């Protein structure tokens, strides 16, 4: 399931910003020290409309690219809040069976979940007046910072953190999960048999969030030309680095090239995969299972056309990079850059390099029809939690992927419309021999934020689970495609 940190952050954001939804949540406690005011970020474009772009730190602050390189002004406090988040849930059930001979079997079960957290938070913001003063007093550093030069050469856009939601003191999160079960039976006859049993299991988890941790942030785009500026009102047409006249066409092509979904639509049309009436515009706008399936199917068809030996090489090495986050990020960055620029890509080491070798020509240029689906897959895998990635790496060594795929597909199909809460019954044929918290498929779904139950197997759908569940479906679909034997 989502971490205790993630769940609390989402609830606090909902209370502080309401329905505006423009605060970007920090995804883990490890990253809660990274997104400070004035911090510079790179935005990784999403390969699908079903998951959002991701921001990553470039290890620079605004002062690192300006002169004089003095500390930035302190951000101003625009409100302090005390938020308490307490959840207490209980599910109970009982069943009794009796036969003609008066034999009886009865049983009961109860599951309870509770969590609590109380925190003092504040909003810190860099005001427009502060930005104007800094622009007047500081100019771009010369020579240009080396990291900035690399980002310029790649044509990446840069963003600066302008506002944060920060804890004022240490926060303790407590989660308790309890299960109880009991059963009785009576079997009459020459030898009357009776039995009774009870069981109880409780799990408690405590997480401490240090004072000064960043829970969420807002960004503005940084503009760099002969002078620097901050774009406080978003404009998707603007680029961070002002292109020279000879580069304007290339930059424009790069911006449009970032829409990998359009490339996948093109692949699908070439192979007549979208003959069910979904054209490109509908595919981009349709937020339903049919749209998700069309995206993923366009990718898988290209992968299935590869020779079995190449597919196995890719699959084996994906299993390795799932356990090596830096390698996975390096491969995703390399493919993204190559797909956007259309030029050669630099070789990579290790399992990421082995995958890249399968996707390039002898000249070192990417084959877009092969690179785009793998880029899409990496984007889906990146949405998943570390626990899910580890489980998928293990599943690649078994034959359970297809059943896991069918179950996730069933959940997505039966939970529409996705914008509403619902309960979805799970077919026992897809659950395996043991359906409980230790089942890998259970954990995969639970990590998406879905609540599951053992008795009368069900999934309780939450709209907030759409992004991770869609990414899980896409990951399972494409990994299964790579493992399929040719027809």
From Swiss-Prot:
Consequence of substituting residue 470 to R? Disrupts intramolecular interactions and autoinhibition, leading to spontaneous pyroptosis-inducing activity
Q: In which tissues is it expressed?
A: Highly expressed in brain endothelial cells.
Q: Which GO terms describe its biological process?
A: defense response to Gram-negative bacterium; defense response to Gram-positive bacterium; innate immune response; pore complex assembly; positive regulation of inflammatory response; positive regulation of interleukin-1 beta production; protein homooligomerization; protein secretion
Spell out which residues are annotated as carrying S-(2-succinyl)cysteine: 39, 57, 77, 122, 192, 265, 299, 434, 487
Question: Keyword Transcription, does the record have it?
Answer: yes
The protein's UniProt keywords, in alphabetical order, are: Cell membrane, Cytoplasm, Glycoprotein, Immunity, Inflammasome, Inflammatory response, Innate immunity, Lipid-binding, Lipoprotein, Membrane, Mitochondrion, Necrosis, Nucleus, Palmitate, Phosphoprotein, Secreted, Transcription, Transcription regulation, Transmembrane, Transmembrane beta strand
Describe what happens upon changing residue 265 to A.
No effect on oligomerization
The name this protein carries in UniProt is Gasdermin-D
Gene name tied to this protein: Gsdmd
């Amino acid at each position: 399931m989502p971490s205790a940190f993630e769940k609390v952050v989402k609830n606090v954001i909902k209370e502080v910003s309401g329905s505006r939804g423009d605060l970007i949540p920090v995804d883990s406690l490890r990253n809660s020290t990274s997104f400070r005011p004035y911090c510079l970020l790179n935005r990784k474009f999403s390969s699908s409309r079903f998951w959002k772009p991701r921001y990553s730190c470039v290890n620079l602050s605004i002062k690192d690219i300006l002169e004089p390189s003095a500390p930035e002004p302190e951000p101003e406090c625009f409100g302090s809040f005390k938020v308490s988040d307490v959840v207490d849930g209980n599910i109970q059930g009982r069943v009794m069976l009796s036969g003609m001979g008066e034999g009886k079997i009865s049983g009961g079960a109860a599951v309870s979940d509770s969590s609590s957290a109380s925190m003092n938070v504040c909003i810190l913001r860099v005001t427009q007046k502060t930005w104007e003063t800094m622009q007047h007093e500081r100019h771009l550093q010369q020579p240009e910072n080396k990291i900035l030069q690399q980002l310029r050469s790649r044509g990446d856009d840069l963003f600066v953190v302008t506002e944060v939601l920060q804890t004022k003191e240490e926060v303790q999160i407590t989660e308790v999960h309890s299960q109880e079960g009991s059963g009785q039976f009576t079997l009459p006859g020459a030898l009357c048999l009776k039995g009774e049993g009870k069981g109880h299991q409780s799990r408690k988890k405590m997480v401490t969030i240090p004072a000064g941790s960043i829970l969420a942030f807002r960004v503005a785009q940084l503009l760099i030309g002969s002078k620097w500026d901050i774009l406080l009102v978003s404009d998707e047409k603007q680029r961070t680095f002002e292109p020279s006249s000879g580069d304007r066409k290339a930059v424009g092509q790069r911006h449009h090239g970032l829409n990998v979904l359009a490339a996948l639509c093109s692949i699908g049309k070439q192979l007549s995969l979208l003959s069910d009436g979904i054209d490109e515009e509908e595919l981009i706008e349709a937020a339903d299972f049919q749209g998700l399936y069309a995206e993923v199917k366009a990718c898988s068809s290209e992968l299935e056309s590869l020779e079995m030996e190449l597919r196995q090489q890719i699959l084996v090495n994906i299993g390795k990079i799932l356990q090596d986050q830096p390698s996975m990020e390096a491969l995703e960055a390399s493919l993204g850059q190559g797909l956007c620029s259309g030029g050669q890509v630099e070789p990579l080491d290790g399992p990421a390099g082995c995958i890249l070798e399968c996707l390039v020509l002898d000249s070192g240029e990417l084959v877009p029809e092969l690179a785009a689906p793998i880029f899409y897959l990496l984007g889906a895998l990146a949405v998943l939690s570390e626990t899910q990635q580890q489980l998928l790496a293990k599943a690649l060594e078994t034959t359970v992927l297809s059943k896991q795929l069918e179950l996730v597909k069933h959940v997505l199909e039966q939970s529409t419309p996705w914008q509403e809460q619902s309960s979805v019954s799970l077919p026992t044929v897809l659950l395996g021999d043991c359906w409980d918290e230790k089942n890998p498929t259970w954990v995969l779904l639970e990590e998406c934020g879905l609540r599951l139950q053992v008795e009368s197997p069900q999934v309780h759908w939450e709209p907030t689970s759409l992004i991770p569940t869609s990414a899980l479906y896409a990951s399972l679909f494409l990994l299964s495609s790579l493992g399929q034997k040719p027809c």
